[in-house]
Swiss-Prot record:
GO BP: tRNA modification
Family to which the UniProt record says this protein belongs: Belongs to the tRNA(Ile)-lysidine synthase family.
Gene name of the encoded protein: tilS
Origin: domain of life: Bacteria
The keyword Ribosomal protein appears for this protein: no
Protein name as catalogued: tRNA(Ile)-lysidine synthase
Source species taxonomy: Bacteria, Bacillati, Bacillota, Bacilli, Lactobacillales
Length: 423
C-alpha cells in the first residue's frame, strides 16, 4: 500500500473536512507509527494540525524507551506530545478505559476535535469473529466504525479499509505481548483465524463483508422507520413484534454505556409491550420511565442532589443526607429513636435493583411495596434507604417512614435518630 492510495481514500471520504486540530493515538507499533507518518507527511495537503497522544502501560521493559522515542520525535518535528502512565492492576479493559479517558481529556483541554487511531481491516475481521464467538447480538456484528462520536468530537479510523500487510514496514517497536495466548484476541489473531483461513483463504474478507452488510441492514431499517416516534407507546405497540425488537435495539444505540445483556433486553422489551406504568433502575445509572403514553431511558446526572451517593454513618456520629439529619447514638432512651445494632455502621443510600425489606416472616421487594402502597412512579426514585449489616432498616419516602418488622428489639443496643431539616 502506498500512502498516496490512503490519501486518495481519505480525501474521498472527507474524514477531516470539518476538523483542523487532530490528536493521533500512537502506541509505537507498526500500525500507529504508519498512521503518524502518513498524517505528518500529508497534514498540509489535508489542512490539519496534528498532535501525538501516547499511554505508557509500564508492562514491558521497553515501554519507557518507546515513550522517550516518541517524545523526542514529536519535539524534533515541532508536534505537541501528550503522555500518561497507567497505574494499578493491569487488564485489557482497564487499560483501554484509561487510554480513551485520557484521550477525551486531552481533546477537551486542548481543543482537538478528532481522535485518529490506526485500526485496520485485520482488526475489523478479528472484532467480528470475537463477537460471533461471544454470541453478541446482530447489531454488534456491524463491527468497528470508520467514524463515530467521541468525547467532544469524533473518532476517525482512516486505515480501516486497508489490511495490515499493506502497511510499509517502517521503524516501530514490537510488542511481544501480542504473541502470547493470554488474551482471547491474541488467540484469535495467532491461532483461530490462521487455521480457519486454511479452509477458506477469504475468511477475513467474508467477515468484513458480513459486517458491512449488517451495517447496511440496520441503516436501511433506520431509514424506513425514521419517521416513527418510537417513544410513543401506541405507535411502538402497533408495530409487529419483529419491528418492535429492532426499534428498541436502534433506540438503545443512543446509550452506548448502558450495555444491556440479551436477558435484560428481552425483559425491557417485555415491559414496553405489557406494562402501562413503569419507573425503575436499569443499570449503569440509567432508568426507564414509562406511562401509558410515552417511555424514555434517562441517565442520572452526577450533579443531581436527589441522587447523591452512599454515605456511612458510624456509631456516635451524624451525617446529612437529602433533607434529613441522621445520628447514631447509644440507646439510652428506648422511647425515642429507631432501635439498631451498635456494632455495625449504618449505610444511607438510594434505591438499588432487587432491594428488599423484611416484613415479619417474609421479605418484600421495594418495587412491590411501592405498588402496594400506591406510590406514584415518579416519586419512587426519591426514596432514601437506610441499611445495617446488609439488612434494610427503613425507607424514607415523601414524609413517610416504612420500618422493617420482625427483628428482636432487646438485642438492639443503639438508636438511630432522624431529623427533617425542613421542619
Amino acid at each position: 500500500m502506498t500512502y498516496e492510495k490512503v490519501l486518495k481514500y481519505v480525501q474521498e471520504k472527507k474524514f477531516f473536512e470539518t476538523h483542523y486540530n487532530i490528536l493521533i493515538a500512537v502506541s509505537g507499533g507498526v500500525d500507529s507509527m504508519n498512521l503518524l507518518h502518513f498524517l505528518h507527511i500529508y497534514q498540509k495537503k489535508l489542512q490539519i494540525r496534528i498532535a501525538v497522544a501516547h499511554v505508557n502501560h509500564k508492562q514491558r521493559p521497553q515501554a519507557d524507551e518507546e515513550e522517550i522515542y516518541l517524545k523526542n520525535w514529536a519535539r524534533d518535528n515541532h508536534i505537541p506530545f501528550y503522555t500518561a502512565v497507567f497505574k494499578g492492576i493491569f487488564s485489557e479493559k482497564k487499560a483501554r478505559d484509561f487510554r480513551y479517558t485520557f484521550f477525551k481529556n486531552i481533546m477537551k483541554e486542548h481543543g482537538y476535535t478528532a481522535l485518529v487511531t490506526a485500526h485496520h481491516a485485520n482488526d475489523q475481521a478479528e472484532t467480528v469473529f470475537l463477537r460471533l464467538l461471544r454470541g453478541s447480538r446482530l447489531r454488534y456484528l456491524t463491527g468497528i466504525k470508520e467514524i463515530q462520536e467521541f468525547g467532544n468530537g469524533q473518532l476517525i479510523r482512516p486505515f480501516l479499509k486497508f489490511h495490515k500487510k499493506e502497511l510499509p514496514n517502517i521503524f516501530h517497536f514490537d510488542d511481544d505481548s501480542n504473541q502470547g495466548d493470554s488474551y482471547l484476541r491474541n488467540r484469535i489473531r495467532n491461532h483461530y483465524l490462521p487455521i480457519l483461513t486454511q479452509e477458506n483463504p477469504k475468511l477475513s474478507q467474508h467477515l468484513i463483508q458480513m459486517s458491512e452488510e449488517t451495517n447496511l441492514l440496520f441503516k436501511a431499517f433506520s431509514d424506513l422507520t425514521s419517521q416513527l416516534d418510537i417513544q410513543d407507546c401506541q405507535i411502538f405497540r402497533s408495530q409487529s413484534e419483529a419491528i418492535q425488537y429492532f426499534l428498541l435495539q436502534n433506540y438503545l444505540r443512543k446509550f452506548p454505556n448502558l450495555e444491556v445483556s440479551k436477558a435484560q433486553f428481552d425483559n425491557l422489551l417485555h415491559i414496553l409491550r405489557t406494562k402501562d406504568y413503569y419507573y425503575d433502575y436499569l443499570k449503569n445509572n440509567y432508568y426507564l420511565k414509562k406511562d401509558k403514553k410515552r417511555f424514555k431511558i434517562c441517565k442520572i446526572g452526577p450533579e443531581t442532589d436527589r441522587f447523591e451517593g452512599e454515605k456511612v454513618l458510624e456509631y456516635g456520629s451524624m451525617v446529612k443526607y437529602g433533607q434529613y439529619i441522621f445520628s447514631f447514638q447509644e440507646g439510652s432512651d428506648s422511647k425515642k429513636g429507631i432501635p439498631v445494632k451498635n456494632d455495625f455502621p449504618i449505610i444511607i443510600r438510594r434505591r438499588k435493583p432487587g432491594d428488599k425489606i423484611k416484613l415479619g416472616s417474609h421479605s418484600k421487594k421495594l418495587r412491590r411495596l411501592f405498588i402496594d402502597e400506591k406510590i406514584p412512579i415518579f416519586k419512587r426514585s426519591n426514596a432514601i434507604i437506610v441499611e445495617q449489616d446488609s439488612d434494610i432498616i427503613l425507607i424514607l419516602l415523601d414524609g413517610v417512614t416504612y420500618l422493617r418488622k420482625g427483628f428482636k428489639d432487646d438485642i438492639m443496643k443503639g438508636r438511630l435518630y432522624i431529623q427533617n431539616r425542613n421542619w
